[in-house]
C-alpha cells in the first residue's frame, strides 16, 4: 500500500497539472458574479464582494456591443471618490480602462472590494454623443468574477 501511495505521489510531481487538480479540489473556485446585461450610457454597474483570506481573483469581461467601457476594481473608500467623479485609486492588476475585453487575474489580500463596469465619462472611456445626441449609447457586457 505504501509503495502504491509513493508511486502516486511521484507521478503527481512529474505530471504537469496533477497538483493543480489537487489544489482545485482542496480550494475550489468560487463564483462571485456571472451575468450578461446592458449598461446604459452615463451609468455603471457596482459589484461588491468580500474575501476572507488572500485569494486569486479572476475577472473575464467581454463587451458584446456598444462603445468601450472602463473596468475598475477598488476599495469601498475609492468607490465613493469614483462616484463623485473625483480622482480615485484602483487595483491595476484587476482593472482595464477603455476596454472591449479583459481576462484579468491577481492574488489580493482579504477584504471588501468593488468592481465597477463603467459607461460614464468618469473614467478613461467616454460614451460617444454627449450633449449632441439623445441616443442611449448603452453597452452589452458579459462578465464573470471568481475567487480561489
Question: Language-model segments: which ranges?
Answer:
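Solvent-exposed, flexible loop/coil segments flanking beta-strands in beta-rich domains
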Residues: 21-58
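Hydrophobic beta-strand segments within beta-rich accessory/binding domains
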Residues: 48-71, 113-118
Amino acid at each position: 500500500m505504501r509503495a502504491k501511495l509513493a508511486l502516486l505521489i511521484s507521478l503527481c510531481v512529474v505530471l504537469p497539472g496533477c497538483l493543480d487538480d489537487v489544489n482545485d479540489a482542496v480550494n475550489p473556485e468560487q463564483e462571485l458574479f456571472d451575468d450578461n446585461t446592458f449598461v446604459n450610457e452615463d451609468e455603471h454597474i457596482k459589484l461588491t464582494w468580500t474575501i476572507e483570506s488572500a485569494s486569486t481573483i479572476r475577472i473575464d469581461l467581454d463587451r458584446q456591443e456598444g462603445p468601450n467601457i472602463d473596468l475598475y476594481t477598488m476599495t469601498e473608500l475609492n468607490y465613493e471618490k469614483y462616484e463623485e467623479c473625483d480622482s480615485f485609486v484602483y487595483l491595476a492588476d484587476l482593472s482595464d480602462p477603455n476596454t472591449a475585453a479583459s481576462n484579468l487575474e491577481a492574488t489580493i489580500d482579504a477584504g471588501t472590494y468593488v468592481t465597477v463596469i463603467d459607461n460614464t465619462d468618469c473614467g478613461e472611456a467616454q460614451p460617444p454623443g454627449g450633449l449632441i445626441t439623445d441616443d442611449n449609447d448603452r453597452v452589452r457586457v458579459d462578465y464573470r468574477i471568481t475567487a480561489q
